[in-house]
Amino acid sequence: MTKFFQLYNTSKMDRIILLCMVSTCLSVVHTQKFLFSPKWGPIGYKAREEHDDGTAMDEIIKANEFQASRIIDGITSLREGDIAVSAGRRSKVCFARSCLWSKSVDGHVYVAYRLSPEYSEMETKLIKKGMENIEKGTCVRFVPRTHQRDYIDIQPKSGCWSYLGSRGGRQTISLQSPDCLQVGVISHEFMHALGFVHEQSRFDRDNYVTIMWPNIWRDRLRNFEKFKTDILDLPYDYGSIMHFGMFAYSQDGEPTIIPKNSKDIKLGQASTLSHIDKLKINKLYKCSDKDD
């Protein structure tokens, strides 16, 4: 009661200031609840809270939706969540020979890379592990750059993303620390750099999965488009490291992709390439020497 009379006896201006301060604090609290509530929070927020069978792409979505702008710079934007596209450049189909990395006379595809000195020793080991995932069972070899004109520049920029296929000259792969430094995420981005799109982008995907359009966040519907890509005469790969998870870009925690054959089929991978992922690499690059 004493505090009430003290407040009552303060000047009118003091009471106004006090009320404004209280109102501001409440506004901040309500704003935070609005921005980060399951219903209105960042894309897939509720889905990630309720489902623990995550994929590499789920981690990429988490990193990019929370921290990375879809506009990387004035002329480059992100498509399908993590594919960097420059204005005026075709982005989707990369099975023309012009966007593949060159194959050596010894039958291997040597992809040169430069690693940012900003990464710690442990982070460097994780990145190399992600590259080794791709090397095992394929003819692709990642080598530190010496004099090569075409190479991948690995940088801790904002978010996890890569260009599609070889662009010629220096091209960036962004692996933000620590969010993108997971082995599966790293392998996923390098697969884009080798020329591979997301598995559910295949033109024949409707034979294998159902896209639940009403469950997808409205401004991410384009991430589920189909494209005329070369499927390399290989079966649809539910377990590809390039496949979206079942709850990718869910606005309400409900599935956005459902397998047609069985709802028990797991979509995507968390950390390793599937057997078919490796077959894709070997067929696309016409590998004859498949070292283990």
What are these regions (language model features)?
Residues 8-292:
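Zinc-dependent metalloendopeptidases
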Residues 2-7:
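Polybasic, low-complexity terminal segments and linkers that are predominantly intrinsically disordered
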